[in-house]
Amino acid sequence: MPITTTRQQDTALFVAAFFDEMVRWGVCEVVVSPGSRSTALAMAAYELEQRRPQDLRVYVDIDERGAAFLGLGLAKASGRPVALVCTSGTALANYYPAVIEAETSRVPLIVLSGDRPPQLQGLGAPQTTDQLKAYGNHVRSFRAMPTPRGRDRDIAFARQAAREAVLAAVSYTHLRAHETSQDL
């Protein structure tokens, strides 16, 4: 009998694989600006830090602009990509000055933003901003992550996306992940 999972479990497995792969490829620090849409991302980072504190350090800053510049400073100091995690809506916009600075200074940053599911885009739902090309030409790559469905290929995709993000973050990358709670 096949094992069934919930959307939250599918998302948790997806983002856990994503963070595990980022760490494997050299990301040692994550700065989280907590918010409801990025809960799965924040929890995956925190849980990985708890399991492997020698491999990952997670910082929390409720001010998105300050968090982004903290991440920028950490990346400048280490020369390694730092991941920034924020929720949807205008939180993403508050990272913009640091993203521009990262591009100008050639500092490796990876922005991971939570988002509403695609079916709520463009309908006036709160905390919904068109994230496609939100940073314009200031990032090397943008990828909208699919909604995980609990398939093995979802995990493979998460790992591939993480590798590509780290490799592209020789400067700057932005990935958007959909929040998948039952109470949309």
Which residues does each PLM region occupy?
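Conserved thiamine diphosphate
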Residues: 80, 128-172
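Hydrophobic or amphipathic alpha-helical targeting/insertion segments
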Residues: 100-118, 138
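Active-site-proximal loop->helix
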Residues: 73, 117-134
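Hydrophobic/aromatic ligand-binding patch that stacks against planar heteroaromatic rings
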Residues: 70-74, 98-101, 134-135, 168
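Conserved small/polar residues in nucleotide/adenosyl-binding loops
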Residues: 173-180
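Thiamine diphosphate
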Residues: 2-88
